Amino acid sequence: MTQILLPIALLCLFAASTLSNPLLVELPNGELRGRDNGFYYSYESIPYAEPPIDDLCLEEPRPYTERWENTFDATRPPVDCLQWSQLISQPNKLTGSEDCLTVSIYKPKNLTRISFPVVAHIFGGGWSFGAAIDDGVRPFSSSGNVIVVKTTTEWERLGFMSTGDSVIPGNFGLKDQRLAIKWIRNNIARFGGDPHNIILLGFSTGGSSVHLQLMHKEYGQLVKGAISISGTATVPWAVQANARDLAFRYGKLLGCNNPKNSRELKDCLKKTDAEEFVSTLRHLQVFDYVPFGPFGPVVESPEVESPFLTELPLDTIRSGNFAQVPWLASYTPENGIYNAALLLAKDANGKERIEELNTRWNELAPYFLAYPYTLKRSEMNAHSQKLKYQYLGYKNFSVVNYFDVQRLFTNELYKKGIELSLDSHRKHGASPVYAYVYDNPADKSLAQFLAKRSDISLGTGMGDDYYLLMNNPLREPLRADEKIVSWKLVKMVEDFAAHETLVYDDCVFPNNLGKKKFQLVVIGRNYCKQLEVESFARHGVQ
C-alpha cells in the first residue's frame, strides 16, 4: 500500500508547488523560470545531457548534472543542433549549435487537471537535419489536455557516424533520445505531468526513432504507448549498412588521410572544426540533397559496452523481445512525395530535373532508394533497372511520367517497410497494434516547398497529417476542413495518451494483433472508415 501511495503523494506535492507559482519549477539542478504564453506555459531549452563538444564529441551522451547558482532562464526557444539543413534555400545551409541537447515542455492552462498525460515528441529530418523548434505545439496547447515535451537530439556526423566498432559505435542520436525520455520520466511530475502516462510521437525519422526506442524491452516500463507517423524501424532508410567505410571516406574529405585504425580516425575528427565537419556533408550529396541522410542508425559491434542496437530491428520484433506497448503506425498514399518532389524543380535553363534521371538513373537510384552500400555495383544496376521497368516500363523519365516515380518512391521507401513492421508486430507481439492512412491533400505542403512550384497537384504526401498535430509555417494557413481534422487528430492522440483507446471521430481503430488481414482506419477530408486489406503496399490504399 505504501508503494502505491508514495508516487501519488509526490505527484500531489509537485502539483501543489507548480500551482503556487507555475512559472517557477524546482529541479535537482536548481530553480528554473518559464514563460506565460496566454493559454499555456512553456519551459524551454532545459539541458538533459552535456553538450557533445571538445572531449565529449563522438562520445556516449552524459546526463547533465550542473547545479545552477541562479534561476535558470527557461524562456529561450530551443536551438537547432548543428546541421546542413535541406530547409535552407541558400547555398550555405549551415545552421545550429553543438550545445543543443535540451527538452522543452509545454503545459496547458487547464485548472480542471491536477496532472496531465504526456506526449514526448521526437522530430524528424532524414537523420541529418530538423529541429524541435520547427514544429509548434499550438494544436495541443489550445486543446489543453496533455503536456507536450519536445526533445532535441544530435543529427548528422555527431549523431550517427560509426566506425563499426567500439571506438565510434554510432547511434548517439538515439542514445540522446533514450536519455531524454528517462529525464522526462524522472522530472515531468515537477511540471504537472504524469510520469506513468507518457507516450512517444514522432514523424519521418522521428517515427522510425520512436519505433527503434521500442526495440528495448524495458521501455515498456518507461512509456505506455507510441505513435510512428510516416516512418518505422523497418523502412529501408532506418538502419545503415557499411557505416565504417563511410566514416573513413568522410574522414578523408576532412583531411584525415590514411588513418591506420578507428582510433586514429577519431583522434583526427575530434580536432576538426565542428562547422567544417558538418558542412562537409554536401560533398556526399550526389543530386540536390540526395542522399537525404548519409549517416544513420547502425547495428553496433558486440564489443560496445552500452549498445543501442545489437541486431536488426526486424529480428528483434520477430523474437518478441521488444517493448510491449500499444503502437500506432501511419502513412499517406503519396508518402514518397518528400523524396520525389525535388525532381519537379527546374534547373537554371527552366528544364525539370527529373529528366536527368534518363542518363543518371543507375548512378542515382541507389542514393534515392537507400541501397548504395548494401549491393555490389553490378547488382545495384540490375536492381535499379528492375525497379524502373516495374514502375515505368519502357517510358522515359519526364514530368508526364512523374507520378510513376512518386509511386515508386512511396512503395519502396515507405509502404513496404511500414507494412513489414505492422505484419511483424501482429504476428510476434503481445500488445495492440494499430494503423491509419491519411488521405486529404494539403494546398500548402512540404512537397510544394521542395518542388518550388504549386501548379501540380501532388496528392496527399508526407507531413500533410503530421503538421495538423504539430503546426508549421509551411502548412499555414489551414483550410477550414483541415482545422476540423486537426482538432480530431489532436483528440485522438489525447485519448490515446489518457486512456490507451484509439478513436478518430466515430471510427474505432481495430487491433491488428493476430489478424490475417491488415485493419486500417482511413482518414479523409470529411470522413473516416475502417478498411481491411491483405497488403496496403500492393493494394494501393487511397
UniProtKB/Swiss-Prot annotation:
Keywords: Disulfide bond, Glycoprotein, Hydrolase, Secreted, Serine esterase, Signal. Glycans are attached at N110, N396. GO terms for molecular function: carboxylesterase activity. Disulfide bonds join C81-C100, C256-C268, C507-C528. The active site is at S204 (acyl-ester intermediate). GO terms for cellular component: extracellular region. It catalyses: a carboxylic ester + H2O = an alcohol + a carboxylate + H(+). It is an enzyme of class 3 (hydrolase). InterPro entries: AB_hydrolase_fold (IPR029058), CarbesteraseB (IPR002018), Carboxylesterase_B_AS (IPR019826), Carboxylesterase_B_CS (IPR019819). It is found in: Secreted. Specifically expressed in the ejaculatory bulbs of male. Its EC number is 3.1.1.1. Residues 1-22 form the signal peptide. Transferred from the ejaculatory bulbs of males to the female genitals upon copulation, plays an important role in the reproductive biology. Belongs to the type-B carboxylesterase/lipase family. Monomer. This is Esterase S.
